[in-house]
């Protein structure tokens, strides 16, 4: 039972003065019925409020620092700007309680029901929230530094502008969560599920997002400076105008993600999946795409000079008219890719695979194709002055009207290549002529074989028609 004197005094304006004069007294309000009372600004520090009923009470600005609040009732209560620092609120039902601007630093709210509660602008730094249900809660503008979110339910929870610095959200599910303008600096979001989440303008400086899911998430204008997204899944995510300074995206799944006007320096996309990604307007400096899968990616007219594509795959990719002077494409797979009219001066394509690659009209001055396989590639009208094709395979390639002045062709394979009106390097004119002759002979032989087969099929059809007209030939007796 509550101390009658304490309970009676609490309802008067003299309460706070009494607390000052009796600082060593611990108010005993055990089981007190405070329902509907106006406790605005009351000094309740270190008070024993076990089993007290705060239903519909107004505790705006009240100070409950280190108060005992076990088994209390809060239905319909309002505690805007109240102080709950170092309080134990574990297992309480705080559904729809108004805590806007309240302070909960170092408080414990473990396994609480916080459904629909309003913590807008509240300070929950270092608060323990493990196992609580925050479904539908409002944490817009709240401070949640160093909070552990393990086991928390966050369905339809709003974190607009919340400060989640150094928060631990590893393995948390926040599918379609609302985090616009949130600050995740130094937070741990490893394996966190943020599929379809609103992360516009969010700050992920130094954030751990390894193996996290951001698929279909809206990350427009988000900042990922020094963030770790290795093995993260961000399929069809929106990274429009996002920043990626020193971001690690190694082995991340970025298929069909949008990078419109995105940028950053020292970005690592090594071994990442960038299938069908549009990077035309992206502006990355010193980006590393080593071993990345860029099949069917769109980079038309992009400036690739600061990039490295060692071992990358460009199968079916569009790189027409790109600026890639001096870029390293060694061991890359450019099969079926288009580099039409591209600037590839002094680019390194050594050891690359380029079956049916389109390099027509491209600028290949001083480019290195040593050991490259360019079978059936299109190099028409290419300017390959001084290019190195040592040990390269150009079988079936079309070299028509190209300029190979001073190019190197040591141990190069030309079988079936077409070199009509091509300008060969000194001493290689005969080789080009023979290549063209063999190509024409092969075409003629193939054409003759096709014509012969066509005649055979026609004769079979005629015989089949004649057989159909004749009466069936019967043998034997009935």
Where are these regions (language model features)?
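Tandem repeat scaffolds
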Residues: 5-10, 14-456, 464, 474, ...
């Amino acid at each position: 039972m509550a101390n009658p004197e304490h309970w009676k005094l609490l309802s008067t304006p003299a309460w706070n003065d009494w607390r000052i004069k009796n600082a060593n007294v611990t108010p005993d309000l055990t089981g007190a019925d405070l329902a509907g009372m106006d406790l605005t600004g009351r000094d309740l520090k270190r008070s024993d409020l076990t089993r007290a009923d705060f239903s519909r009470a107004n505790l705006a600005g009240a100070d409950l620092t280190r108060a005992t609040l076990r088994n209390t009732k809060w239905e319909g209560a309002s505690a805007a700007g109240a102080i709950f620092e170092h309080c134990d609120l574990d297992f309480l039902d705080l559904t729809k309680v108004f805590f806007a601007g309240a302070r909960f630093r170092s408080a414990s709210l473990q396994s609480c029901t916080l459904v629909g509660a309003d913590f807008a602008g509240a300070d929950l730094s270092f608060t323990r929230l493990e196992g609580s249900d925050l479904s539908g809660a409002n944490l817009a503008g709240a401070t949640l530094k160093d909070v552990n979110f393990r086991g928390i339910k966050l369905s339809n929870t709003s974190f607009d502008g919340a400060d989640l610095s150094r928060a631990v959200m590893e393995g948390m599910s926040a599918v379609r969560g609302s985090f616009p303008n949130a600050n995740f600096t130094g937070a741990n979001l490893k394996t966190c599920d943020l599929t379809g989440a609103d992360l516009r303008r969010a700050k992920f400086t130094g954030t751990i997002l390894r193996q996290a899911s951001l698929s279909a998430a809206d990350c427009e204008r988000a900042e990922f400076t020094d963030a770790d997204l290795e093995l993260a899944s961000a399929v069809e995510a929106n990274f429009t105008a996002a920043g990626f300074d020193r971001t690690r995206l190694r082995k991340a799944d970025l298929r069909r993600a949008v990078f419109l006007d995105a940028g950053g320096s020292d970005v690592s996309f090594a071994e990442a999946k960038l299938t069908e990604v549009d990077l035309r307007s992206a502006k990355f400096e010193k980006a590393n795409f080593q071993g990345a899968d860029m099949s069917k990616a769109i980079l038309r007219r992009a400036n690739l000079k600061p990039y490295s594509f060692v071992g990358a795959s460009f199968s079916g990719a569009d790189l027409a008219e790109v600026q890639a002077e001096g870029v390293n494409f060694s061991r890359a797979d450019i099969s079926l890719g288009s580099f039409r009219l591209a600037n590839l001066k002094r680019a390194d394509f050594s050891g690359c695979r380029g079956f049916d690659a389109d390099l027509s009209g491209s600028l290949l001055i001083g480019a290195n194709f040593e050991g490259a396989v360019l079978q059936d590639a299109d190099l028409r009208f290419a300017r390959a002055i001084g290019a190195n094709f040592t040990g390269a395979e150009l079988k079936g390639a079309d070299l028509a009207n190209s300029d190979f002045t001073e190019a190197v062709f040591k141990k190069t394979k030309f079988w079936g290549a077409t070199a009509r009106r091509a300008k060969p390097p000194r001493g290689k004119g005969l080789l080009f002529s023979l290549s063209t002759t063999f190509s024409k002979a092969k075409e003629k032989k193939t054409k003759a074989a096709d014509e012969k087969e066509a005649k055979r099929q026609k004769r079979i059809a005629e015989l089949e028609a004649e057989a159909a007209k004749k009466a069936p030939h019967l043998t034997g007796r009935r």
